[in-house]
Amino acid sequence: MDFMAQDPEVFGAIHNEEERQEHNIELIASENIVSPAVRAAQGSVLTNKYSEGYPGHRYYGGNQYIDVVENLAIDRAKKLFGAEFANVQPHSGSQANMATYRAFLEDGDKVLAMDLTDGGHLTHGSPVSFSGQEYHFYHYGLDPKTERLNYAKIREQAEQVQPRMIVAGASAYSREIDFKKFREIADHVGAFLMVDMAHIAGLVAAGLHMNPVPYADVVTTTTHKTLRGPRGGLILAKAQYGKAINSALFPGIQGGPLDHVVAAKAVALGEALQPSFKTYAQHILDNMQAMVSGFEEDPHLRLISGGSDNHMVLIDVTGYGVNGRQVQDLLDEVGITTNKNQIPGEQNGPFKTSGIRVGTAAITTRGFTADESKRVGELISAAIAQRDDQPALDQIHQEVLALTARHPLS
């Protein structure tokens, strides 16, 4: 019996989601579109296998081919980022972070990381996250004038806090991060340096953003976002920390790995090792700069930090008298998918927010050009400006449909 006949409800929901992706412009910075090969690996018979442990040291039999796949993923990750050690088993970036904290820290240890409202992540010490509940996090923010990292100020905070670990990396920061300066700060106070490069991993792989691996003791990342792989996590580190990281992940916080996802990671890492991936990553940056130029023409929109060095930009939308949630919902109506996002000095709270975050990874995968990316930025401005004009919004939606029709998902 085929899928549709066996379970029409689930099949229908998946079909509808496929249609949504096909006919919407995806600008959520943490999302991308995987290749057919990655999807094939993730939908393979490897989903049937259980393989607690690591290659050559499993708690179940019949893992000889699973070992081949996992070793390929490990070797490719190490080669791609120049790492001494890689663990490809984390189910997510959050679990990669949890395992890393447990490998390096004791409960209650002090950690210095980026504040969530200034661009950090929940797992960087938010009180609603395990990280903020198990460890004593202190936070650095952005310079209120430049809305960029102030390394001198971070150094001062590190001197005051004397943390066991410093975390560099962000989920909503549009400027390049200087990991060498973070290494110097960590050395100055005798702290471990952890880098969470989940958003920029693809740019790092392509040589278009500073690589944190030579500077950090440990680097965590997701394998989706700009890396264009399956949803999952990855840990890279100095060889001396490998045993502790492996133990912290399994049996520490996970049981068996998701072998079908590990296979998809291996495929995606192999794709990222190809010369064409650097061209793709450069197009992500080119498209973002073009989109920024479209936003800059609108005096009612303010770009946080004035622009972008990577695949994303944060936009303060309050100049229009609206909040981020309202803009997110409005853009959904015209077929443009974004997410509301807090901005530095947030006044509206996390559920309404003052801004939105947009990224160009997914539209670049679809083949959008720089001119089309600029036009998308202009359409966003037009939709907000004409939010009470339904005929105008309908016309914008038609243009969105025309753009997506030029660039089918596959």
Swiss-Prot record:
Keywords from the named record: Amino-acid biosynthesis, Cytoplasm, One-carbon metabolism, Pyridoxal phosphate, Transferase
Intracellular or extracellular location(s): Cytoplasm
InterPro entries registered for this protein in UniProt: PyrdxlP-dep_Trfase, PyrdxlP-dep_Trfase_major, PyrdxlP-dep_Trfase_small, Ser_HO-MeTrfase, Ser_HO-MeTrfase-like, Ser_HO-MeTrfase_PLP_BS, SHMT-like_dom
Binding site for (6S)-5,6,7,8-tetrahydrofolate: L116, G120, H121, L122
Names of required cofactors: pyridoxal 5'-phosphate
One annotated GO biological process: glycine biosynthetic process from serine
A molecular-function term among this protein's GO annotations: glycine hydroxymethyltransferase activity
This protein's record includes keyword Transport: no
E.C. code: 2.1.2.1
Catalytic activity: (6R)-5,10-methylene-5,6,7,8-tetrahydrofolate + glycine + H2O = (6S)-5,6,7,8-tetrahydrofolate + L-serine
Metabolic or biological pathway: One-carbon metabolism; tetrahydrofolate interconversion; Amino-acid biosynthesis; glycine biosynthesis; glycine from L-serine: step 1/1
Site (Plays an important role in substrate specificity): H224
Gene Ontology cellular component terms for the protein in this record: cytosol
Keyword Cytoplasm: yes
Family in the record: Belongs to the SHMT family.
Listed PANTHER family: SERINE HYDROXYMETHYLTRANSFERASE, SERINE HYDROXYMETHYLTRANSFERASE 1
Protein purpose: Catalyzes the reversible interconversion of serine and glycine with tetrahydrofolate (THF) serving as the one-carbon carrier. This reaction serves as the major source of one-carbon groups required for the biosynthesis of purines, thymidylate, methionine, and other important biomolecules. Also exhibits THF-independent aldolase activity toward beta-hydroxyamino acids, producing glycine and aldehydes, via a retro-aldol mechanism.
NCBIfam families: PRK00011.1 (NF000586)
Protein's recorded name: Serine hydroxymethyltransferase
Provenance organism: Lacticaseibacillus paracasei (strain ATCC 334 / BCRC 17002 / CCUG 31169 / CIP 107868 / KCTC 3260 / NRRL B-441)
UniProt gene name: glyA
